[in-house]
């Protein structure tokens, strides 16, 4: 397999764009953190997080670049890790930080135009698009990057969903474990709920790698996706936690 450190300059070469993404996230993070910190703390969080992010950029593994949608997800999670570290230094609890992370996702995906969400919801279950997603999963799973995502297509047999996706390896989980931040992974997983809600795609999940399960069992159906907060209402959050 190809070692991911063969591409250590991939993100550093795109430094300007990486910082642009960081600032885009800050607008969402600042809004979500307002009930918990002062404006002075907010500016300090930004400063601390930016320095943290600068140190993390060279450590982000190459998992396929622009040809893999998971790359953007991974970068977003690294940005959030930088903010998480800053919030920790401000003395915020895990639960409060987790709530800020979730609401930051909510604010981030709220920027998606409603018309795009309507189109995405209709496209998701068109047969040719389902086949395309299956092929994409197979292509990404075959990539030789050890720190990336691996998932497989799951056909429906009982009518409870249209199709599924079992993620057996998660780049975000690997990165967070490596940086002693595993306990926050379940909160990162919650970001899927506001995303699919905004895209008008029905989605549910009962297991996640972040909670110690072998796979994240994404299941897609027609209809609405429930809110991801508070997480105790979700099947994936129930039972013992192993983070």
Model-inferred region functions:
Residues 1-90:
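N-terminal, charged low-complexity regulatory/assembly segments
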Residues 67-75, 176, 180, 184, ...:
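Conserved aromatic-histidine-acidic binding/catalytic patches
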Residues 75-179:
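Amphipathic interaction/junction segments at domain boundaries or subunit interfaces
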Residues 185-208:
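Conserved short secondary-structure elements within globular domains
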Residues 209-223:
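C-terminal edge-of-domain segments
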